[in-house]
C-alpha cells in the first residue's frame, strides 16, 4: 500500500433496498427492525454486556455483535436467538470488528490496547497485535493482507498479516486520539478521523 504525504515512520455500509436495519444499543438484546414499517421482526439474545459494534459477514449469513470483552456470532438465517459462536480473549470493551472478504477470519480492536485476528470457522485466535494505548477502530485493507488501526494516543498503525509486523506508524496530530479509520476501496487513500475541541478533523495521511 502506498502511503501519501504525512508524518509517519516506516518499520456500516447499507445494501441498496435493505429491508432490515440493526441499531447499536447500550443494552442487550439486539433487534432486527423492518425499515419501512418500524416493526421489530426478530430479537437476538446478548445478555453479557452492551453492544458496541455490529458487522454482517459478506455473504450475509452471520452477524457479529461486539460487546465488553467478547464477540458473539449469530446465524441470521436461523431462528435460533442465541449465538452460534463466542470469541473470547479481550479484557476490555471491543471497539471495532470487520470480516475478511470471504468471511474466513475476523479482526477486532479493543480498549485493552490490542488488535486480534480470529478464525471464524474454529473460533481460535490467530494474531495478536499490541498498541501502546486503547484502540478505537480497525479496518481491513482491500488487499486483505493488511490491517489499519487507530488508537487514543493519536497513532495509526498498518499491520502486515503475512509478516505479522507493523509496517507503518502514522501520527496525524500529536496526542489527539484517532476515533475512526477508513481506506478507499482501491487502497489508494487512507483517512483518519479525530475529535479536537469541537467537530471532527479528517486528515489525508
Spans of features found by a protein language model:
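Cationic, amphipathic, low-complexity alpha-helical segments enriched
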Residues: 1-3, 12-18, 24-25, 205
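Per-blade loop-tip surfaces of WD-repeat and WD-like beta-propellers in eukaryotic adaptors/scaffolds
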Residues: 3-9, 32-49, 68-92, 117-135, ...
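Canonical WD40 repeat/beta-propeller blade segments in eukaryotic WD-repeat proteins
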Residues: 10-11, 17-22, 49-55, 92-98, ...
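Residue-level detector of Asp-centered blade-edge/turn motifs that repeat once per structural unit
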Residues: 16, 58-59, 101-102, 142-143, ...
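Conserved strand-to-loop turn within each blade of WD40 beta-propeller repeats
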Residues: 24-27, 65-69, 109-112, 150-153, ...
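Hydrophobic packing within well-folded, soluble alpha/beta domains
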Residues: 30, 54, 94-97, 106, ...
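C-terminal closing repeat unit and adjoining cap/tail of repeat-based domains
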Residues: 188-189, 205
Amino acid at each position: 500500500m502506498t502511503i501519501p504525504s504525512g508524518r509517519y515512520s516506516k518499520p456500516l455500509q447499507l445494501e441498496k433496498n435493505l429491508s432490515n436495519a440493526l441499531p447499536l444499543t447500550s443494552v442487550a438484546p439486539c433487534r432486527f427492525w423492518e425499515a419501512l414499517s418500524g416493526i421489530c421482526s426478530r430479537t437476538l439474545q446478548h445478555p453479557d454486556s452492551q453492544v458496541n459494534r455490529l458487522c454482517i459477514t459478506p455473504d450475509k449469513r452471520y452477524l457479529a455483535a461486539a460487546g465488553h470483552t467478547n464477540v458473539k456470532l449469530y446465524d441470521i438465517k436461523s431462528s435460533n436467538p442465541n449465538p452460534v459462536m463466542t470469541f473470547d480473549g479481550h479484557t476490555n470493551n471491543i471497539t471495532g470488528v470487520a470480516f475478511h472478504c470471504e468471511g474466513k477470519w475476523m479482526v477486532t480492536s479493543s480498549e485493552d490496547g490490542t488488535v486480534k485476528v480470529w478464525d471464524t470457522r474454529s473460533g481460535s485466535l490467530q494474531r495478536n497485535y499490541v498498541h501502546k494505548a486503547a484502540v478505537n477502530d480497525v479496518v481491513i485493507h482491500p488487499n486483505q493482507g493488511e490491517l489499519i488501526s487507530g488508537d487514543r494516543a493519536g497513532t495509526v498503525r498498518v499491520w502486515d498479516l503475512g509478516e505479522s509486523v507493523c509496517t507503518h506508524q502514522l501520527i496525524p496530530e500529536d496526542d489527539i486520539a484517532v476515533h475512526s479509520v477508513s481506506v478507499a476501496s482501491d487502497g489508494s487513500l487512507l483517512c483518519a478521523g479525530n475529535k479536537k475541541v469541537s467537530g471532527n478533523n479528517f486528515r489525508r495521511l
